């Protein structure tokens, strides 16, 4: 734990995160749990008062305050007149700013971790040319969601190992 996990498709970065848990079964299957920077947004709480700031400016300030890396933060266009958040998670603060932008402009943005950098992208332009299954090296995945820890994206890629007859994670 504590190491860096990187997933790439050729030279395109897909996931950059930090290993927080490693498990091994009696069948020598290894499971690695890693989180990107959005995990830090959910784990930290703060109090903020914003006046006349856009959602992208709010995310930039949060990232600077908590020394998180940022990438492309699309100009969300809408200056939020006033937003007061007391003891809220950084993730909830950022999402409220994005929600207020949607409510007031009809434009939808997504906050995500773009290979180790927080990013805000207009959903109209967000698309990933990637597939999982036949013709790719990744033939399966697991997506978990639960009410207790639904705070991050968790992806588990597995590949059939023809040499060992097992699946490699």
What is the predicted function of each stretch?
Residues 67-75, 101-116:
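Short, well-structured beta-strand/strand-turn elements
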Residues 25, 78, 126-127:
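Solvent-exposed loop/turn segments at secondary-structure junctions
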Residues 56-60, 91-95, 154-155:
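Extracytoplasmic/secreted envelope proteins and their assembly/folding machinery
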């Amino acid at each position: 734990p504590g190491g860096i996990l990187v997933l790439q498709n050729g030279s395109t970065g897909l996931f950059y995160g930090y290993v927080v848990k490693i498990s091994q079964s009696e069948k020598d299957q290894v499971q690695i749990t890693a989180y990107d920077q959005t995990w830090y947004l959910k784990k930290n709480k703060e109090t903020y008062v914003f006046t006349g700031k856009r959602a992208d400016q709010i995310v930039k300030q949060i990232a600077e305050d908590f020394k998180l890396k940022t990438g492309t933060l699309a100009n969300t266009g809408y200056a939020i007149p006033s937003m007061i958040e007391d003891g809220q998670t950084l993730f909830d603060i950022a999402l409220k700013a994005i929600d207020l932008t949607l409510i007031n402009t009809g434009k939808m943005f997504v906050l995500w971790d773009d290979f180790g950098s927080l990013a805000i992208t207009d959903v109209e332009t967000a698309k990933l040319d990637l597939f999982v299954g036949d013709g790719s090296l990744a033939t399966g995945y697991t997506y978990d969601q639960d009410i207790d820890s639904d705070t991050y994206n968790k992806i588990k890629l597995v590949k059939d190992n023809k040499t060992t007859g097992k699946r490699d994670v």
